[in-house]
Amino acid sequence: MLELANLTKTYGGRTVLSNLSHVFEAGRFVAIMGESGVGKSTLLNLIAGLDAPDSGQVIVDGTPMAALDDDAATRLRRTRMGFIFQAFHVLPHLSLQQNVALPLLLNRSATARAEAMLAAVGLAGRGADFPRQLSGGELQRVAIARALVHQPALLLADEPTGNLDPETAGGILRLLRAEIKANGAGAIMVTHSHAAAEMADEVLLLTREGLRPA
């Protein structure tokens, strides 16, 4: 379970999130929609630990993230969370297989699992290729495969299909949902697409007043 308790975040004197509280139940695929600039990406960054709130807490399975030391917090995020962000990164000096296998470096099944995920996102047989050989949309699919490869308990996705054509996007969203449900995991997906939001169990709208059912 993920709980947000009175999160507040300001940038340059502008309050983006104010005393936001919400409980995300385990195993639910939740889509978050809202107007541009309302703080959707900021919210994901706070949950992911990429930024810190000015006040309030992110609580994972009853443990406030702020109570963990850096090593423990990093270990929790690496083992229990998967991330797909708009500014995704792949390592240019590693092959696609190596990029996808990064979360599984200590796992003997890393190679097979990475190849299986590449196939699942439509890149079967491309594991030995390097990022420079791929288009932007293909690189995004590599980032999605990497986010799912270690079967995270919670997936955080910010416009995960933004650079993909509608047909490919639909396939990727079906894959996300299937992986999440197969593993009993949860997901929080920020999207502006109503078609993408329809894949979720629950759709929330983020406004200046907080989160509410869409």
Give, region by region, the residue ranges found by the protein language model:
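Conserved switch/coupling elements of ABC/ABC-like ATPase nucleotide-binding domains
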Residues: 208-214
